[in-house]
Amino acid sequence: PVMIATSGATLIAEDAIAEMRARLFPLATLITPNLPELEHLAGRTLRDTVEVADAAAEIARTYACHVLAKGGHTDDERIIDTLVGPGEERSAAFGDPRIDTPHTHGTGCTLSSAVATLLGHGLPLEHAVRIGRQFVRRAILAAPGFGQGNGPLGHQAVRNQSPSS
C-alpha cells in the first residue's frame, strides 16, 4: 500500500485505507508495507524485528496473503525485510547493509513493481523478493543525485540485466 510517506504524512484518506483492507488485501498475493504503514495496519507501535514479524504474520493471516514488512524506515545499520505468509510464522528474512544516501525516493514502489513483474515471469515469491531487493539496491547505488532531499533512483543502471541475475 502507498499510505504513509517517509515523512510520516498520510497520503490517502482513512476511508480509502478501510476500502483497501476490505476489498484489495484479500485479493492480493503480497502487500509491502513500510514500517509506518505496518504500524498503522497493526494499530500499534512496533519496537523491534520480533514485533514487526509478529504484526506482519497477523496481517498475513487476517487477509490470507503474504506480507513483506520493509525495514528501511528504521535507524539500524542493516535493513531487514521480513516476508511472512498466511500459514507460516516467518517465511524469510532478507538483510543488507544500509546505503548512506538521500536518493531513495520511490524505493517501495520500485520494489513492489519489480516483485510483481518477476512473479509474472513465473518466479516463486521468495526468489522474486530476493531479486527485486537486489534490483532496488543497484538502483539506489546508481542514483543520479538530482536535486536536494530524497532524490530518485537510478533505474537505468539495471534495465539491461536479466531478471534472474
Regions found by a protein language model. Give the residues of each.
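Residues at secondary-structure transition points
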Residues: L11-D15, V50, P102-G106
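Phosphate-handling active-site elements
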Residues: R90-A92, L118-G132
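Short clusters of hydrophobic/aromatic residues that line enzyme substrate/ligand-binding pockets
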Residues: L11-I12, L46, F94, L153
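Glycine-rich beta-alpha junction loops
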Residues: M3, E37, G72-D75, P97-D100, ...
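Conserved phosphate/ATP/ADP-binding segment of small-molecule kinases
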Residues: E14-S91
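Charged C-terminal helix
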Residues: E126-S165
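Short, small-residue alpha-helix embedded
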Residues: E39-H40, T101-L125
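Conserved beta-loop-beta/alpha segment of the NTase-like Rossmann-fold superfamily
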Residues: A5-S7
